[in-house]
Amino acid sequence: MLKPITMFATKPEEYAAHPVPSLDEWHQLWSTWDMVTRQMIPDEQLLDKPIKLRNACVFYLGHIPTFFDMKLTEATGGNPTEPKYFYNIFERGIDPDVDNPEQVHSHSEIPDEWPSLDEIMAFQKRLRQRVKNIYASGQAYEDKWTGRALWLGLEHEIMHLETLLYMLLQSEWALPPPTAAKPDFAQIAADAQKNAVENEWFDVPEQTIAVGLDDPDSPEGPVRHFGWDVEKPPRKTHVAAMKAKGRPITNGEYAKYVFATGKKDLPASWLPLDASNGVNGVNGVTNGGQSEQQFIRDKAVRTIYGPVHLEYALDWPVSASYDELNGCAQYMGGRIPTLEEARSIYYYVDALKQREPSKTLGRTIPAVNG
């Protein structure tokens, strides 16, 4: 097995130790971004749209440095990185309403022809040098507004790493990460089945919880961790008692739901297989005359390593839309928790861990019965 290109911290006191990201954290992020954009997307596919309601892949290569440069320019009062016309085409992507694609918020103009890859990479290089210069001058830590812009840029790039990865999963041409060997999915499935436990309901008591950040978002400070608009203001809310499952809905549980209800559509993360165990490219399902076992054998799950037979992914959390997951949760006797309910679950689990370090409940709860 090859070691990952970098190791990202999992605890807040580690990955958010200071309100301003370190230059080392930037280098780690840039190496990961470069791996995904330059080694997992073939150059000839940069103009492709794996998700039709999104921009082409090349947009994101220009959007990340351009949007960040705009925020640094606002924060520092400096000059834009050239070419400045990138601001016109890379500031904001398209994000139409899924149910009515005609409803689209304002977005950057889409050019008849995107800039060349070399132009975009040169702009990215200049932007990264601008970031390095800010740290070298001490401005990153001495100027509060600049520090906030740096954190905004870090989170924005991380979020779009996720955007690109779920876009690549919808493509037929994505390349696997070059720094990791393909997992033995059959062995992983066997181990998961051997160690499987029942997905129990847990009682979560009523409690009052805090939601949101105390972040005034002003250049005068005080120095606090950056928060997006939806994370503010801080407030308290009372959450009623409920029962919650101990882990996410799995592919196996979702397969039972689809088979039992005769749903005609599969989640976008699945693929049907043809008789020769190949992908047939049709996102539909029929279960007339099929056994549940045959239904499962005829499906695959999209991964960055290519399709993996569903029978090897039954214990994975299912990736599906809210409506799809909520339908399954209702079939299982519950529903999807609200934001406040999910936060209440996390609060309760954290309290249990502090009282009983040896006892661990699931981190993510898929269904609520209350």
Regions found by a protein language model. Give the residues of each.
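N-terminal regions that are enriched for targeting/export leaders
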Residues: 2-46, 50-53, 135
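Short, contiguous alpha-helical
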Residues: 2-3, 24, 43-102, 137-192, ...
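Acidic/His metal-coordination segments adjacent to aromatic residues that form catalytic metal sites
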Residues: 104-117, 141-142, 310
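Short, well-ordered surface patches within globular domains
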Residues: 151, 161, 167-177, 251-252, ...
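Flexible inter-domain linker/hinge segments
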Residues: 172-209, 215, 220
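Hydrophobic helix-coil surface modules that form long, contiguous segments used
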Residues: 199, 206, 210-212, 216, ...
